[in-house]
């Protein structure tokens, strides 16, 4: 992680417990080293026990990742960087529209049987990640379920979380797999207009309006090797890994943007 990226991430990190009056002793390891280790794990897809000796012990890094996930710190950090990216792109800090979709990924042997399933359509045994993104492809929320969960069933808690976190979102786009009662449910329960973008021709590649944005986000996420397959015992940990994959992308984008402004001030 470059110095420019650290300057972007550091203000968004949760304050240390010993500084916020919650007690405890000062941390033994530098927070930048902890963040570097998490980013390395997510980007390179290594096993926890294969953490290089240049980083803090893997147990320490795992404890921090788990603590930030349970406290919501990772999601808050991600949300702050997303707001900065939207402002840098000339958008409002909070989105008004979203696109939803799902992606099934194979599960490693570390994934318990009760949290995995089989996606008959994609012929994938593992888990399914349901995501909502804004109109420029930045992640809004993610939900991980067993791969056997139907898109419509997974979309309900996803849209519920979306509405709870973003009161500004008024419309969402989805493919034909989400058609049916979900559209009515979203309108009556969430006051959200869910618009279905149908595929015009089967067995032919066509760039669908709005739909390509979420597909590009999936491509961004899978640049991080830890997300290509699900290795996490807990679905919540895989959700955290997805957030971290986007944190890496957004921090690099913001760092480049800041450096560009320094070189060419307006």
Describe each region flagged by the PLM.
Residues 1-266:
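Short alpha-helical elements
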């Amino acid at each position: 992680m470059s110095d420019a990226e650290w300057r972007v991430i550091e203000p968004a990190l949760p304050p240390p417990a010993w500084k916020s009056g919650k007690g405890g002793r000062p941390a033994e390891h530098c927070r930048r080293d902890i963040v570097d280790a998490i980013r390395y794990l997510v980007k390179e897809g290594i096993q926890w026990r294969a953490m290089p000796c240049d980083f803090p012990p893997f147990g320490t890094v795992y404890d921090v990742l788990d603590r930030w996930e349970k406290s919501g710190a990772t999601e808050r950090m991600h949300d702050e960087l997303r707001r900065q990216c939207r402002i840098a792109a000339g958008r409002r800090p909070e989105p008004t529209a979203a696109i939803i979709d799902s992606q099934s990924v194979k599960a490693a042997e570390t994934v318990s049987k009760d949290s995995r399933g089989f996606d008959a359509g994609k012929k994938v045994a593992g888990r399914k990640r349901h995501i909502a993104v804004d109109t420029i492809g930045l992640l809004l929320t993610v939900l991980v379920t067993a791969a056997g969960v139907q898109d419509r069933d997974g979309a309900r808690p996803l849209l519920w979380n979306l509405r709870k976190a973003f009161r500004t979102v008024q419309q969402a786009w989805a493919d034909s797999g989400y058609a049916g009662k979900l559209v009515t449910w979203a309108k009556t329960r969430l006051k959200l207009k869910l618009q279905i973008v149908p595929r015009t021709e089967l067995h032919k590649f066509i760039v669908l309006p709005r739909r390509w944005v979420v597909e590009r986000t999936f491509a961004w996420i899978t640049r991080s090797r830890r997300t290509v397959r699900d290795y996490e015992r807990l679905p919540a940990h895989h959700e955290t890994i997805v957030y971290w994959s986007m944190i890496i992308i957004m921090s690099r984008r913001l760092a480049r943007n800041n450096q560009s402004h320094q070189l060419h001030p307006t």
